Curated annotation (Swiss-Prot):
It comes from the Eukaryota. The gene is eloF. Belongs to the ELO family. It comes from Drosophila melanogaster. PROSITE patterns: ELO. It is a multi-pass membrane protein. Signal peptide: none annotated. Pathway: Lipid metabolism; fatty acid biosynthesis. Its main location: endoplasmic reticulum. This is Very long chain fatty acid elongase F. It catalyses: a very-long-chain acyl-CoA + malonyl-CoA + H(+) = a very-long-chain 3-oxoacyl-CoA + CO2 + CoA.
Amino acid sequence: MFAPIDPVKIPVVSNPWITMGTLIGYLLFVLKLGPKIMEHRKPFHLNGVIRIYNIFQILYNGLILVLGVHFLFVLKAYQISCIVSLPMDHKYKDRERLICTLYLVNKFVDLVETIFFVLRKKDRQISFLHVFHHFAMAFFGYLYYCFHGYGGVAFPQCLLNTAVHVIMYAYYYLSSISKEVQRSLWWKKYITIAQLVQFAIILLHCTITLAQPNCAVNRPLTYGCGSLSAFFAVIFSQFYYHNYIKPGKKSAKQNKN
């Protein structure tokens, strides 16, 4: 089993049995067990719980974002052109560990969203994109932590992700207030656009990093980050096309006829 290389470990998450068991349990519940349990039951009304969850996610991701921006641009702990993890004896190493720990733990908190979908019988939202995205972010985040430790090339990429999540969960919270408020929110599709921009920036960042022969990053992991972002860009583009472009073309064709 994988063992983290940094001597300072994340409680619970650093245990490979608990982590992998959680991820396998997540897949089993959302794809098989959960729908089976809910098959002959009425959907749960979880509006209050979901609002609290959304507020928590806004505050949690906002905290990571503020800490990360301060770390990058105020403390200037990294050389932006070539971001490598801080050495073990660096004065800001504990801060790097804290920010990365908060981020990785949040990827497991994100899994709760799919469980809400199952309990509310929102089967349409339990798509391949949704499940794979949540699973992959937690799984590959854990692998990065095991094989690389804290920080490094993925650090600014994670901050981009938290910024998008603040916007996304703000939308979720506002849309949960009432149907009238939900209908007035015109910027839903721009969340997907923000995600696509995020993946493009990550891919560009990985490419620029790898193009520097003297940049001592972990190259296999940097290739992995770039490849995963490219794959996400493809499946999110497909989602955007089928949900926002294709319906518009169909509507225009019907109006023309």
